[in-house]
Amino acid sequence: MRSAKLVLAFIMALVGYTSYSQEAIIYGNAPDYKGDEIVFYYYSDFITSTETEVGRCNVDEKGTFNARIKILETTYVFGYLGIYKIYFFAEPNKKYQLLLPPKEDKTEAQRLNPFFRETETQVGILNVDKSDINFLINSFDLKFNENFDQIVMDAYKGKKSLNIDSLVNSIENQYKNTNNQYFNDYRNYRYGLLKQVTFYKKSTSISN
């Protein structure tokens, strides 16, 4: 997730924050978590990974939960649920019906292990539509990641002809009518990251 955090930091620098607070509403039903408190955060500083709370809620005896998330703009929001680190992208003035993963608490060994890292999971959203930022990013990542590893491997092997431009054009044709600036910045940064990585790998292979 480190690269994703860099993507998000870059986008935040481009877009900037407004001076007033807005809200997104999250809600759902998760009987597995009844009686638990769920806290949501965002990274107020991506370089130092500073986590700042943006909202919290209690899951009642019926498994129902809801919370107001304080955000300024499209924001990467996350929370810790046992072995999972769930995340999604929240936009102001929207409502998200979350589908939480089955509850799985950390074992004692995991809890005491300073190197244990939660499994990062993009949380399900039951009321998502195809124009939502979560749907767009997820669909893009699936297409992009299908080719990312192979292109990087080809670059490391010193292959002269790489399919970066054709990959970018192929993906962009599917999103050419998308108006979401956050999503546009996200895609462009991922493309730039791919080009940097392949350039580095090719340089390394040549020097060796």
Where do the protein language model's features map onto the residues?
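Bacterial Sec-dependent N-terminal signal peptides
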Residues: 1-28
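A non-transmembrane, solvent-exposed segment enriched in polar/low-complexity residues
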Residues: 22-182, 186-189, 193-207
